[in-house]
Each structure stands twice: as C-alpha cells, then as structure tokens.
C-alpha cells in the first residue's frame, strides 16, 4: 500500500496541467495562450518539471518542442486524472 504521507505525493496540480498542455501543444507560446498565462510562466514550469522528474520533458526540434517518451507517457496517464479532479470540483455539493 502506498504511504499517503510520502513526500513524493506532494504534487502541484497546476504543474501537471502545464505538462499535459505542453505535450499536446508542443509550443511554449501556444501553451501560454491556452492556459492564459505568460510565456515566462510556462518556461518556469518546464524548468520545475525538468528538476522534479529529472527528465528534459521537452526537446526543441525546429519550430516545435517534442515531448520525451517519459513526458508523453506521464501526460497520457495524468490527463484523465486531471479531468476527473475537474469534474469532482464541478459537481453539486449536497
């Protein structure tokens, strides 16, 4: 069983949301537009993701950023969880 007090569970949901959108958009500027934040905010998020997961996350390839295999796999796993969290926060409370 997972230790719920583990420091590895200290996740920033916004950071995970940035990861998902970065993998989808493959562009810092389009990610910033979609999330209604500045490009420096997205760049700072990339830096935090790289440090947190010890992975380049995105690698420049011409005009776009290509996700690493780890970033792609993480985004694919995280996206449905983020959707569910959003749905839970939108449900009426009774």
Residue ranges and their predicted role:
Residues 52-53, 74-94:
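Alpha-helical linker/hinge and terminal dimerization helices associated
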Residues 20-36:
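Short helix-boundary/capping micro-motifs
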Residues 27-28, 46, 60:
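Helix-turn-helix DNA-binding elements, focusing on the entry/boundary residues of the two helices
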Residues 15-22, 74:
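Short alpha-helical "packing" element that flanks the helix-turn-helix/winged-helix DNA-binding module
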Residues 1-7:
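Short, Lys/Arg-enriched N-terminal segment that forms or immediately precedes the first helix
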Residues 50-67:
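A short LG(V/I)-centered, amphipathic sequence patch enriched
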Residues 12-15, 39, 71, 78, ...:
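The N-cap/first-turn positions of alpha helices
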């Amino acid at each position: 069983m997972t230790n719920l007090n583990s420091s590895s569970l200290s996740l920033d949901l916004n950071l995970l949301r940035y990861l998902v959108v970065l993998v989808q958009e493959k562009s810092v500027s389009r990610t910033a537009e979609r999330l209604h934040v500045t490009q420096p905010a997205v760049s700072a998020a990339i830096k935090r993701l790289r440090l947190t997961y010890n992975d380049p996350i995105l690698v420049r390839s011409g005009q776009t950023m290509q996700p690493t295999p780890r970033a792609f796999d993480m985004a694919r796993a995280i996206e449905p969880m983020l959707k569910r969290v959003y749905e839970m926060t939108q449900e009426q409370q009774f």
